[in-house]
Structures are given as C-alpha cells and as structure tokens.
C-alpha cells in the first residue's frame, strides 16, 4: 500500500482533535501536481495566500523559495502542536505523581474502605494508561509527519528538477517536532511509575510501545487485548496508535535502490537490521555529514554511468 493511503488511513483512525494538526500531505501533493511548467510560483490565491517568491531571479530559484515558504508554514503547525502536547504531558505527569503521593499518605485511615482505595488507584492507573498511549501516539506523529515531508520534497524535486530535498530535510531534522528525546524520557518515566504501581499493566504498555515488534492486529485479537478493554477513551488512543504503527511499518521496508534520503535508511541500521525506534532525531546514525557524503557518492556513481554510456555510444571499450 502506498504511503499516501497509509497516511490517510491513519488520519481516519487517529484522535479527532489531532486530525488537522498533521502535515497537509494530500493538499501538498495536489499543489505539486499543479505547479506551472515554466517554473514560476503559482498565484498567491492558489496556495492559501502563501507569500510568493521575489520573482527577480531564476524561475527555479523563485519557485523553490516559494515552496519552502509553504513548507515553513506546515513546519510551524507541526512544531506548535508538538510543543503544546509535550508541555501538557510534563504538567500532567507531575500532577499524577503528586496524586500518588497523596494517596499513599492517606492510605492508612483516610479511606473508608479498601474498595475506595482500590477505586482511587484504578483511576490513577487509567490516567497513566491514557497519557502513556498519547505520548506514544505523539512519537508516531513525529515519525509520520517527517516521513510525509520527505515524500513531498522528493515529489517536488522530481516535478521541478529542483534540489530542495536535501537542505530542507536537514533543516527539518532539527525542528522541535522531530526532537523527541524529552518525550522519550517522559514515556520511560510514565512506564517506571506504572511498573512500580501496576506491574502487569506496565508489561502490557511496554510491549505496545515497542514499535519494532508491534504488528497489526485483526479485530478478534484486539478484542481480547488487555489494553483495549480499559474503557472507550483508552481504546481510542490504543487504536490510533496501532494505525500509526501500521503506516510506519510500510516505511521500514528496505528500498531496492540506494538513496541517501530513503526512509528505509532512517528505520534500519548500517547492517540492515531494523532499528527499535521510530524516525526521530534519536536515530543519529545518519548525521548531516553522512547524508552529504551519500549524496556525493550518488553523484559519482551517476557520473560514471554517464561516462560509460558515452563510451558505449562512441564504440569505445567499456571500463570495468
């Protein structure tokens, strides 16, 4: 299944409040498809009033500057939402930890019955389960949007003959929405609290958060999963995360051709083994310099192929 279909399927399954916060992948594809052949930026009205290029230089450069502005607006949207959610999770986790301490402090004598204490702890567990699921979903939000951005940049370069992919991808890798180390620490902190308070629940959640091992499940399997039986709200988060993981799994497939910007490179190590994490800034095996080196290698290979073809056309012997 193509990435666009997977991306659309994920949007249909994700939390309703999140749907308009994702990369406008479909709209950007249409925009690229309708780019004029002369290399000039389309009218401002055709791109939701995005400022056009200066238009006082090479048409390709002006078009590249204009499209970069379009993508800048998308990056701003992604960053704003990601930062907002991450800050909310920091606050929410602190509130839950304080709530746990209060429950512990009044355990001996403050509760009228054991059932009241159990109910309070179950409410805390539910809150942890939901926030854990949403943080995992935010990690996949980062991965899918970055993957979509890479796809869009490739389509733009192919359509226009531009060279926007490499510099813009490098820039995107340093944006807040792609810097997931703080979020990963929050996930681990949440799992540590769950393991301490609810060992069985923690095992279930840690298994679900392992993107390298998570596989799509059918309806029968999901109906028997412990995480799907907590309640409707928790199930919505769980289902949304599964949909995101399914889309990411399609990106893990190794490419048949070498490409420094191939999404499979962000999902596999140098030895070809799948990485355990999503496409995030934590996948630091591919630094800016390595991508540049890979680009140089590609140019050298292309140059050799051109020389070989020219020699063959001239009837000269082919260098081995």
UniProtKB/Swiss-Prot annotation:
Subcellular location, record wording: Membrane; Nucleus; Cytoplasm
Matches recorded under InterPro entries: SPX_dom, SPX_prot
Tissue: Widely expressed. Detected in root cells, with the exception of epidermis, and in mesophyll and vascular bundles in leaves.
4Fe-4S in keyword set: no
Pfam families per UniProt: SPX
One annotated Gene Ontology cellular component of this protein: membrane
Phenotypic effect of disruption: Growth inhibition, Pi accumulation in shoots and up-regulation of phosphate starvation-induced (PSI) genes downstream of PHR2 under high phosphate conditions.
Subunit-structure text: Homodimer. Interacts (via N-terminus) with PHR2 (via C-terminus) in the presence of inositol polyphosphate. Interacts with BHLH6.
Protein's name according to its UniProt entry: SPX domain-containing protein 4
Originating gene: SPX4
């Amino acid at each position: 299944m193509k990435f666009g279909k997977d991306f659309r399927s994920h949007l249909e399954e994700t939390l309703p409040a999140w749907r308009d916060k994702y990369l406008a992948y479909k709209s950007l594809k249409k925009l690229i498809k309708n780019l004029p052949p002369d290399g000039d930026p389309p009218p401002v009205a055709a791109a939701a009033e995005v400022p056009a290029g200066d238009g006082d230089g090479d048409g390709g450069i002006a078009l590249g500057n204009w499209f970069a502005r379009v993508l800048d607006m998308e990056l701003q949207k992604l960053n704003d939402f990601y930062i907002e959610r991450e800050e909310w999770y920091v606050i929410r986790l602190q509130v839950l930890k304080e709530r746990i301490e209060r429950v512990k402090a009044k355990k001996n004598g403050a509760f009228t019955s054991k059932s009241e204490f159990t109910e309070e702890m179950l409410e805390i567990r539910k809150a942890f389960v939901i926030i854990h699921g949403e943080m995992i979903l935010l990690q996949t939000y980062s991965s899918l949007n970055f993957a979509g951005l890479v796809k869009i940049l490739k389509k733009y370069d192919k359509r226009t003959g531009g060279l926007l992919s490499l510099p813009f991808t490098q820039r995107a890798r340093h944006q807040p929405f792609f810097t997931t180390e703080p979020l990963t620490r929050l996930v681990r902190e949440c799992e540590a609290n769950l393991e301490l308070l609810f060992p069985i629940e923690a095992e279930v959640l840690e298994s679900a958060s392992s993107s390298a091992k998570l596989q799509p499940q059918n309806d029968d399997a999901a109906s028997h999963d412990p995480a799907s039986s907590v309640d409707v709200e928790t199930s919505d988060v769980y289902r949304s995360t599964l949909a995101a993981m399914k889309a990411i799994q399609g990106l893990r497939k190794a490419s048949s051709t070498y490409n420094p910007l191939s999404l499979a490179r962000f999902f596999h190590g140098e030895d070809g083994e799948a990485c355990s994490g999503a496409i995030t800034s934590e996948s630091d095996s591919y630094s800016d310099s390595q991508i540049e080196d890979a680009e140089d290698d590609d140019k050298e290979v292309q140059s050799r192929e051109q020389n070989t073809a020219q020699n063959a056309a001239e009837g000269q012997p082919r260098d081995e």
